[in-house]
Amino acid sequence: MSTRLGFVFTLLLLYWFKTMWAYTVDFNLDIQGFYQVFLAVINPIPLSLLFIGLAFYIKRTKLFYLLSFSIYVILFIWLISNSIYYREFTDFVTVNTMLASSKVSAGLGAAALELFRPWDIIYILDFPILAFLFLKKLVKLDPRPFNKRASFAVTSLSAMLFSANLFLAEIDRPELLTRGFSNYYVVRALGLPAFLGYSANQTYMANKERSKASEVDLKPVEEYVASHYAQPNPETFGLAKGRNVIYIHLESFQQFLIDYKLKVDDKEYEVTPFINSLYHSNETFAFANVFNQVKAGKTSDAETMIETGLFGLNQGSFMVNYGGTNTQQAAPFILSKNGYQSSAVFHGNAGSFWNRNTAYKQWGYHYFFDASYFTKQDDTNSFQYGLNDKIMLKDSIKYLEHMQQPFYTKFITVSNHYPYTTSLIGDEIGFPLAETQDETINGYFATANYLDSSIKAFFDYLKASGLYENSIIVLYGDHYGISNSRNPALAPLLDKNSETWSSYDNAMLQRVPYMVVIPGMNKGKVIETYGGEIDMLPTLEHLLGIDSKNFLQVGQDLLSPNHSQIVAFRSSNYFVTPEYTSYSGRTYYTKTGEEITNPDETTKEQLDKIREAANLQLKISDSIQTGDLLRFYTGNDLGKVNPDDYSYNNSMKALKKIEKEKGDASTSLYSQKGNQSTVDLFKAPSYKELHPEQFSSSSSSSDDSSSSSSSSSSSEKK
């Protein structure tokens, strides 16, 4: 290390070691065979040598050491950022993600700290050691500069190594960079610095795509939409026509929670009793095989799909990157053209989170009630992702009752949000924790139980106020709550073996609830049809008697007998059908979970056909989204949203003004009740009030112990 060359190669070795640590401990790169191991071992070297080696061109001693170490620190930050990001998103940081970071960082706070692990000390151990060596002058600065020829030789060597790396990577995975198989393929083959360049190019191409798009690009889109359209089921078309629409967003809620009973100390606890009752009600169309189709945009991806019938982006969040600029024909705007008088979103977090306050205007939402409209947040009523659900729902009533009917609304809950250890406070603590080595999993069931009781309180209000009978209530889970990296720890709770846990099991855990409650209907049932979030909008439209035929949407009505049942995940070549599941580069029989390793020709043809259909659906959606093609579309009479028509300031004043102007013609609940408020009809008892027997005597000591553990965990996380 006492020479310039030695110092650079020391930094190179340290970066290589840390990368190997990340590949082994944090990333799931599905490395198989000697060839892929070899690629993974060599890929950190070429570009790190290229970048750190740039310092060889510097003659001044201190500047050489400062520059080389600074480049090393930048590479380190990129590595550790991806390691932490991967733990939650099971993906890598893209340029779009970084560009959007200011829009999604509000409210993250302590949740980011939850992603750190004890072994992260490995990533930073070298910094104090290097500082000690230089401060004690155990390593001396080398004043001898490299000549230009030697410096260029290092640059050339790194370029040759990268070329060789790329050549070998193409042998392992042909068209690696052109077909965009998966981000982890690129990282596995070329490393994180190369992935950053790949991502930057993808972002540039996306922006370029929009600038060069024209009306001509609409033709294949319109042809696809026409051929993909699924005729509505005549038995369900218009079944809920004219009713208020109430969407309830079930944060991080996975399908396996339905009917699940958590066993603690030989006693079973039903996690979501009320939601279970809705699932099995004859007033509910409940879907057993609907999958989330989100990627890094997570909640924003889910919102994009249910509102627009189009996918989120392969990289980053559509709402953040395009939501405030693209022309869109979303549900609130469509319904406003079909007799709906008002629309609103209720969400107890900052309006800027996921760029909602801008994207919602492009979607045509009349009102957006964010955290500024609700009870002031403090340690007793909220956590880093917003106001707790019961309080948010109660605070929403004073606005909801003034909305003109029929209305279209969405309530975004947050309490069942990662890390599941900080949102429950005081008398809401009591549901037992699971008993695994993962605190995130342990708390997941308690926060889901809290969400369940919040939803019950809201339904009770709807019934007491009279809104229930004239509404259609749609409940949906937005994305997974337990990430794939944690699923093996979850496995025993699902009667599965952690050692044999597979990509098939991960795929099946992408199911999320989708329930359509139509009060007064007796045709409800549990439906086994396979579908995804992309299908929710056309399903709702047809239930409301609005034909989706002339809308540029790529989903299909889940109640249609013509529904294709091909579910495309956002990652290319990931899909699920009733017959086959393709996930993380492996293919399985969906019914049995048996891996297909040597498919016959018939099976190959079927898989190729499904893969082509899934990828085409994503391609068509992406062309609409990245090309902003709806700005050219004239295939319906909706027209275009003017975002300047909407303001989310002083919304209560605006609601009351409309009531006053309409007078006796006002259709708001407040007007219908003779200008009497219904706020007091909302009752949301705490867990302690709902389960007094659990706290009333010493005979319940085991349950009290669980509660105490939960309280302690919550305090520690705060």
Give short role names for the model-derived ranges.
Residues 1-199, 689:
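Transmembrane and membrane-interface helices of multi-pass
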Residues 36, 59, 63-66, 80, ...:
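Generic, low-specificity signal for short hydrophobic/alpha-helical stretches with a mild N-terminal bias
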Residues 41-42, 190-205, 252, 470, ...:
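Conserved acidic functional residues
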Residues 83-95, 114-117, 208-217, 299, ...:
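A diffuse structural propensity rather than consistent per-protein peaks
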Residues 165-240:
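Membrane-interface segments at or immediately adjacent to transmembrane helices
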Residues 225-718:
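Solvent-exposed soluble domains appended to multi-pass membrane proteins
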